[in-house]
Amino acid sequence: MFQSPATASINGLLSDLNLKIEQVLLPLLSGVSRAVLLGFPNHQNVGDSAIWCGERRFLERHQVRILYTCDSGTPIHDVPQHLLNENTVILLHGGGNIGDLWSEPQEFREQIMTRYRSHYIIELPQSIHFSDEGNLNRFADIVRRCERYVLLARDEESLRVAREELGANAMLCPDMAFCLRALPRFAPPVKDIVWLLRRDKESVVNAPVHVLADDWTDDGLWLRYRMLRRILRVLNNYPRRLRYVRLITLRRIYDTIAWGRLLNGCRLLGQGRVVITDRLHGHIICLLMGMPHVILDNSYGKVSRFYQTWTYGSALTRLATTVEEARSRAAELLAAFQERRV
């Protein structure tokens, strides 16, 4: 379990988590100045955009140049071979999608690991969940064939699965969104409690009657991305100079979309004095914004596993097991918030 010497202070906790990320990742990137970052999250989940922005911030801070990026929907043959020689480090975007719950990123990961199994591949911090033993064993076979694959797990249980069941060279590392260090509140809160609850296959919580719960919503940015991607595919058929323009443009598009989604998420959460959420990055973004909040678990324990590994000492956070308990905990935080205002 992570021990922070300043757990009562949010700034101390965030500083300690950033230090831990550097202690784990910088030795793995020793001597590395160029890499590719694969698996951009082109969907509405703000948490994955927060991770992407944190990854990009970390790599910029430590002067690792990104030669190429793509999303997990990219056909494997579209990945440019001339950029992926055996001296190029492949970074796989982190998150919570190693397993059989979300098929697209897992299939993309397996294709990359199979095609480039002699390359140095670093899986940025992930949660792991397989519901089917056959799927787990199949992925374990891919991991064993991947000669220089390093898996960073973002909770203790994922680390156990990575080492004992996948046979991976694995290390424990916090979520890369913490590399953002802080996020803004754009305006004073307008309501006491914001409920941010999942509406997908990881959901196990129903919003209470008479409560209007939000989730990360479709922002329309993907439509602009789809149009631009068509233009960029045309450029790919032209000489190398235009292909270089394509790579630079695509990276900038990804960054713009990710930051747009993340800041929309900050605006949503910032409407409340207190947040109740079952999303892991509802929790992480609240910490980065300095907001009091209550967390509930998702379908397989991802949120509580992360909390118990890294953030259990946060004075801003309460863990609840039921909606009723979450409301009670939120009321306590709200009362404390109002006392500080007096």
Residue ranges and their predicted role:
Residues 1-342:
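Active-site anion-handling motifs in enzyme catalytic cores
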